């Protein structure tokens, strides 16, 4: 049965329409600008090693692995006995040293010298008597009326009397004029050093307690009670999961399309159908080659820029190191002020 020319023409028109639609679809798909930038990365791993500032024996651990801790929360204790003893020692001598300092700089300075006191006068009388005795023993020894030992004793007594007189005069001068400026300065410096020593002892006592430096989760409990610790020995490893961000790499051709503050959505194979809101918080100013650990659909030799996409993660579902996919819409996505 022959096909009529009318039907043949109609079929030809239908074929042309279908072919044109298919061609338009593929051409428009090829030339239409992308509406979303998709990049791949991992939740950045952030950790802190919690350690004491001094040496000592670990007395107690207050948290376990997996516990969520707050900044400033007590984590562990060192044996404080020797640190408390150091504080008690410095605190016991501090009042006496402080009183000596106050007595030193409060001595009045007199313009007129008073009459010699009884101590210099007594020392002067002792010296005069020692000189007379020395002269008498010297004359007797010249005639060999006394043994040489008596002459030596008289000489020693004379030297002692002179030294006592000098000491008494110096004490009188200090009582009259007060301490010298150099003595006051030295006493002040010594007092400051003692005060700093007491503060250091108290600080070392405070450092026998280990507090959490940031909010996080106890990832590793490295030591146990009874272990000896040092400032180089961490006691805990804390995983910091607030805030969390994605470390990803932006292709060079998309650099001009993505800006700081743009909204993004983050998805993970661990939560099918679930997306987490986020925003672009950092774009590296330096280009680099794609790291080997990053799995992307682009060529390995393509230049990329490291980006940081912050994620809203109130329930802590996004775990550190988790691989994720980031979608950054390019339409209706004005950068927000950070």
Swiss-Prot record:
Residue runs in coiled coils: 148-207
Keywords: Coiled coil, Periplasm, Signal
Main location: periplasm
One Pfam entry name: HlyD_D23
Signal sequence, start to end: 1-23
Source species: Acidithiobacillus ferridurans
Family: Belongs to the UPF0194 family.
Domain of life: Bacteria
UniProt KW Plastid keyword: no
The keyword tRNA-binding appears for this protein: no
Cellular component GO terms, alphabetical: periplasmic space
Protein name in UniProt: UPF0194 membrane protein in asrC 5'region
Protein's cellular compartments: Periplasm
């Amino acid at each position: 049965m022959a096909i009529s020319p009318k039907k043949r023409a109609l079929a030809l028109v239908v074929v042309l329409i279908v072919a044109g639609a298919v061609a338009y679809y593929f051409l428009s798909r090829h030339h239409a600008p992308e509406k979303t930038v998709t990049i791949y990365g991992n939740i950045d791993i952030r950790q802190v090693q919690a350690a004491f500032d001094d040496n000592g024996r670990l007395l107690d651990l207050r948290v376990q692995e997996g516990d969520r801790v707050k900044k400033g929360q007590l984590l562990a204790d060192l044996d404080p006995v020797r640190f408390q003893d150091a504080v008690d020692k410095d605190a016991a001598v501090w009042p006496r040293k402080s009183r000596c300092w106050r007595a030193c700089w409060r001595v009045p300075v007199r313009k007129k010298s008073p009459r010699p006191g009884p101590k210099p006068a007594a020392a002067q009388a002792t010296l005069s008597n020692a000189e007379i005795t020395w002269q008498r023993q010297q004359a007797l020894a010249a005639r060999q009326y006394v043994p040489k030992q008596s002459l030596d004793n008289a000489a020693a007594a004379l030297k002692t009397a002179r030294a006592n007189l000098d000491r008494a005069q110096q004490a009188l001068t200090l009582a009259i004029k007060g301490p010298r400026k150099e003595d006051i300065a030295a006493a002040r410096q010594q007092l400051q050093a003692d005060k700093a020593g007491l503060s250091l002892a108290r600080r070392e006592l405070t450092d026998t307690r280990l507090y959490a430096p940031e909010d996080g989760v106890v990832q590793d409990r490295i030591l146990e009670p009874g272990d000896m610790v040092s400032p180089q020995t961490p006691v805990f490893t804390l995983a910091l999961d607030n805030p969390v961000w994605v470390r990803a790499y932006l292709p060079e051709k998309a650099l001009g399309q993505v800006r700081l503050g743009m909204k993004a959505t983050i998805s993970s194979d661990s939560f099918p159908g679930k997306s987490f809101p986020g925003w672009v918080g950092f774009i590296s100013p330096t280009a680099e080659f794609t790291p080997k650990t990053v799995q992307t659909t682009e060529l390995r030799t393509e230049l990329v820029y490291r980006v940081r996409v912050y994620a809203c993660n109130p329930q802590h579902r996004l775990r550190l190191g988790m691989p994720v996919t980031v979608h950054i819409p390019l339409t209706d996505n004005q950068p927000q002020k950070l």
